Swiss-Prot record:
Record's function text: One of two assembly initiator proteins, it binds directly to the 5'-end of the 23S rRNA, where it nucleates assembly of the 50S subunit.
GO molecular function, one term: structural constituent of ribosome
Residues spanning the signal sequence: none
Name used for this protein in its record: Large ribosomal subunit protein uL24
InterPro entries: KOW, Rib_uL2_dom2, Ribosomal_uL24, Ribosomal_uL24_CS, Ribosomal_uL24_KOW, Translation_prot_SH3-like_sf
Classification lineage: Bacteria, Bacillati, Bacillota, Bacilli, Lactobacillales
Keyword list, A-Z: Ribonucleoprotein, Ribosomal protein, RNA-binding, rRNA-binding
Amino acid sequence: MFVKKGDKVRVIAGKDKGVEALVVTALPKVNKVVVEGVNIVKKHQKPNNEHPQGAIVEKEAPIHVSNVQVLDKNGVAGRVGYKFVDGKKVRYNKKSGEVLD
């Protein structure tokens, strides 16, 4: 998967289109990512030690990786490619040519 935890991404589809934020978690088995402050859902929490009455908690839900684009250091969004630099495989932005790793 081309997106890693800690990458800065731009959401390109969905209700949060245009938002730029960091990836909190990458879920490669299901091709999804959790992005900070994006796709907020309300979860009904049963009573427990933390919430004795129960609660409605807002949390970030995963979005499909095809709905985000990785940003480089200059803020240019583009597709991600792979190439070898000094015998090491690195990710790069295909639009700007800048190495991401």
